């Protein structure tokens, strides 16, 4: 199986199946797909809290609400994530919950671009 075939197979999975795949890979290889919570010692974190906030380079794009234009927001979600119609609709309907993450670990520029596209479609978005 080539890498292209693997990517093609992964593209066909639902969000729930992708989450299960990630869990299986984490268990199989003994790793975690989540970003580390604390990268510096406690004393450094207390002293440089404001500086740490400015230096953040990865953001999670979270959908807070889809507003009055649900269909437009679904279209933008599909464009950004490559999800199928059902998966994109399910994600949009989770707006306001912790599960409504459109993109995890996005670079600052990418996260701001995604936020701009979603807000133009009528959604309320938060960068975490």
From Swiss-Prot:
Keywords of the record: Ribonucleoprotein, Ribosomal protein
Signal peptide per UniProt: none
Gene Ontology process terms (BP): translation
Record flagged with keyword Transmembrane: no
Keyword hit for ATP-binding: no
Gene3D superfamilies: 3.30.1390.10, Single helix bin (1.20.5.710)
GO molecular function, one term: structural constituent of ribosome
GO cellular component: cytosolic large ribosomal subunit
UniProt function note: Forms part of the ribosomal stalk which helps the ribosome interact with GTP-bound translation factors. Is thus essential for accurate translation.
Subunit description: Homodimer. Part of the ribosomal stalk of the 50S ribosomal subunit. Forms a multimeric L10(L12)X complex, where L10 forms an elongated spine to which 2 to 4 L12 dimers bind in a sequential fashion. Binds GTP-bound translation factors.
The family this protein is said to belong to: Belongs to the bacterial ribosomal protein bL12 family.
Descriptive protein name: Large ribosomal subunit protein bL12
Lineage of the species this protein comes from: Bacteria, Thermotogati, Thermotogota, Thermotogae, Thermotogales
